[in-house]
C-alpha cells in the first residue's frame, strides 16, 4: 500500500502543476482579448477595400483582372494557418482533418494540391505525411505583423500569377466564442463576385472618378485585399488558439482539484488506518503486560 509520505508528495506535485495551469489560463484569457481587439480593428480595412474592388468590378470595365476570372481548375493552393504551440485541445487536429478531406475531394476530381504553411504545427504535420509544401514560416508572435507572414502569401500569389495555381484557399480556425472554434476553408482566388446590395450601390449611382487608372488601382487593391484577408485569418486563428488554450487549462486546473480531493481522501484513510494500527498495537502490548 502507498505510504502517507508518498501521497503527500503527490498532492504537492499536483498543486504545483495546478498553479502553472491556472497561470496559463489567465495569460491565455488576456492574450485572447488582445487578439480580438486586433481582429475588430483590422476588419473595417478589409471590408472597405472589398467594397472599392466591387465598385470597380461593377463598372463594366474593359480590363478584367486575372484575380476576378474563373479558370479551369487543375491545381489548387492552400494557405494553412496553424499554431506554433500546443496545449490548445483539438484545434490543430480538427483543422488538419478538414484540409485533408478537402484535398481528397480535389484529388477525386484529378486536381492537384500544394500548401503554404504558417505555424510550426502545420509544418510538422504536413511534412510528416509528405504533402507538397512550397513555403512555410514559423515563430509567429501573438501580435503578428504583415511582414511576419508575407513570405507564404507571396509564394502563392506568384504561383497564381504564373498560372501554376487555379484556385487559392485559406484554411484557419474561425473564432465563434470562447467555448467554440470552427475550422474553415475560405476561397481567396479567384475573388468571389459581390452583388450590388453587398456593395451598397446600384449601377445607376456611379459617379466616381478613380485616380490612378482602374487597372493600376485593381492591381494594387486586389493584392492588398488578399494580404489583409490572410492577416485577418492569422489574427482570428490566434484568438481561437488562446480561447482553446484557456478552456484546456481551466479543465486541467479543475481536474487537478479533483485529483487533489481524491488523494486527500486516500491520505486520510491511510492516516486513519495507521492510527488504528498503532492503537491496536498499544492495546495489545498493554494486555500482554
UniProtKB/Swiss-Prot annotation:
Coiled coil: none annotated. One of its GO terms (biological process) is proton motive force-driven plasma membrane ATP synthesis. GO terms for cellular component: plasma membrane; proton-transporting ATP synthase complex. It is found in: Cell membrane. It is a peripheral membrane protein. Keywords: ATP synthesis, Cell membrane, CF(1), Hydrogen ion transport, Ion transport, Membrane, Transport. GO terms for molecular function: ATP binding; proton-transporting ATP synthase activity, rotational mechanism. Belongs to the ATPase gamma chain family. Produces ATP from ADP in the presence of a proton gradient across the membrane. The gamma chain is believed to be important in regulating ATPase activity and the flow of protons through the CF(0) complex. F-type ATPases have 2 components, CF(1) - the catalytic core - and CF(0) - the membrane proton channel. CF(1) has five subunits: alpha(3), beta(3), gamma(1), delta(1), epsilon(1). CF(0) has three main subunits: a, b and c. This is ATP synthase gamma chain. It comes from Hamiltonella defensa subsp. Acyrthosiphon pisum (strain 5AT).
